[in-house]
Amino acid sequence: MASDLESSLTSIDWLPQLTLRATIEKLGSASQAGPPGSSRKCSPGSPTDPNATLSKDEAAVHQDGKPRYSYATLITYAINSSPAKKMTLSEIYRWICDNFPYYKNAGIGWKNSIRHNLSLNKCFRKVPRPRDDPGKGSYWTIDTCPDISRKRRHPPDDDLSQDSPEQEASKSPRGGVAGSGEASLPPEGNPQMSLQSPTSIASYSQGTGSVDGGAVAAGASGRESAEGPPPLYNTNHDFKFSYSEINFQDLSWSFRNLYKSMLEKSSSSSQHGFSSLLGDIPPSNNYYMYQQQQPPPPQQQQQQQQPPQPPPQQSQPQQQQAPAQGPSAVGGAPPLHTPSTDGCTPPGGKQAGAEGYGPPPVMAMHPPPLQHGGYHPHQHHPHSHPAQQPPPPQPQAQGQAPINNTGFAFPSDWCSNIDSLKESFKMVNRLNWSSIEQSQFSELMESLRQAEQKNWTLDQHHIANLCDSLNHFLTQTGHVPPQGGTHRPPAPARIADSCALTSGKQESAMSQVNSYGHPQAPHLYPGPSPMYPIPTQDSAGYNRPAHHMVPRPSVPPPGANEEIPDDFDWDLIT
């Protein structure tokens, strides 16, 4: 006896049976085997037998005193005494008073109890009076199979559980589950679960643009109509565990093993379903990622330099974001204000932005910009200098064939755009200098040597000479399309508005911002400049005549002289 008790306490034979399928099958077999109404829980006061009738002997016993029956039993006796098995409220009152004289002089309280039982007890159902039946009031009858989910004016009694298995089974028909595409379980053999629903696929295609929502919805609807509605439970054999896996020697270990096996099967099935859908999604192309890349082979160099053309409506935001993201992404210090390139970028620059020329990866030989001082890129006032067309680049020298026969990688105004200038530096760094005759580009080699020796803090005329030399070099190598005109020699010392930068105190004096948010007229100082150029109002051309180099002073707004002078020693930072 003790061994049987111990085995019953440690037995987990009931564990495999705790599934939704077993519960539904048990409820179905119980409802089919038992009599009508036997599988439900009756409310308090319900008659034990809905077909019970009052005999004459029992009526004679209760002629003098109060009957021992409940109000629900009295209503059942009254309705079953009728040949049509239905009565109106007044007929029920009359039958009770005729068979039990106690209620004739008991007042009206018992009539209220009769009405409450008819309304709240699920054993009684109201039947509308037919049109051909004259009279007043509806009929009441006994409901042998009451609908538990039928709405009542008041909540049911406390003894009837709201979360009973009977109510859960009645609340989970296919109509309630089919309404939501995410909650539906898949049919057998389909590991993708709810990802095949038209609703989820359509919403997912709006975010990625790689799935046709209409085609998937049509295919899903046709498949559902052909295979029928999905079952209420998962019939996948991967989620079934073997009874032999359970170790009865250690009960806690068996529970842990069972949990681990079910968790692994569910995770593997979900990963397989998501990977089958996400496998065809192409990776997104982000043209603004600043990362160090290896030089690609010559066959792929032209393809990488010319990315696919974005939509026209996105070209202008990319052009505006390119100068702002360049310095801030490298040094980590955002500018004081975002420069707008609408008024200073030439038509060729906008065309270059529309063709997808974003900020290229930063060269490894460039030091961080914060090492030269805490400067921030700024832009001149939009009305300080008018935007002009860039000069034509230097043509190809006569009698010399292009060194590189690849297509043109940059437009003719490559130096007017900071992104194209960065890309040109990167391209020069990728070239194989051993295969190029360096005697033709002595000026460029000398400028690069000076830049490396001075850690790229060149003077303004050195920067201008470097731009001219680089333009000539790219034209000879075939990266810049040659145009008509004579070859212009490198210009002398210039005010390089397109390529020169200032650092330290010169930046604070050059780009002071007044109280209205507009930069003042810059004060031009010769001196060292940092490693990379910055787009300004005159970024279109650096070879313009001398009368265009002098900036037109702008009228300072009121309150400009009230600014606090910058007396901080910026040299201490470096």
From Swiss-Prot:
Tissues expressing the protein: Widely expressed.
Gene Ontology MF terms in the entry: DNA-binding transcription activator activity, RNA polymerase II-specific; DNA-binding transcription factor activity, RNA polymerase II-specific; identical protein binding; RNA polymerase II cis-regulatory region sequence-specific DNA binding; sequence-specific DNA binding; sequence-specific double-stranded DNA binding
Compartments in which it is found: Nucleus
Segments passing through the bilayer: none
Biased composition (Acidic residues): 563-574
DNA-binding annotation, residue ranges on this chain: 66-143
Compositional bias of kind Basic residues: 375-384
InterPro entries assigned to the protein according to its UniProt record, in alphabetical order: FH_FOXJ2, Fork_head_dom, FOXJ2/3-like, TF_fork_head_CS_2, WH-like_DNA-bd_sf, WH_DNA-bd_sf
Record key words, sorted: Acetylation, Activator, Differentiation, DNA-binding, Meiosis, Nucleus, Phosphoprotein, Spermatogenesis, Transcription, Transcription regulation
Compositionally biased region (Polar residues): 45-54, 191-206
Modification N-acetylalanine, positions: 2
Region (Disordered): 26-61, 125-233, 267-408, 537-574
Cellular component, GO annotation: chromatin; fibrillar center; nucleoplasm; nucleus
Record's compositionally biased regions (Low complexity): 28-39, 207-223, 267-276, 315-335
Compositional bias ranges of the Pro residues kind: 358-370
Modified residues (Phosphoserine): 3, 46, 161, 164, 172
Biological process (GO), any one: male meiosis I
PANTHER family, per the entry: FORKHEAD BOX PROTEIN J2 (PTHR46078:SF1), FORKHEAD BOX PROTEIN J2 FAMILY MEMBER (PTHR46078)
Name assigned to this protein: Forkhead box protein J2
Gene: FOXJ2
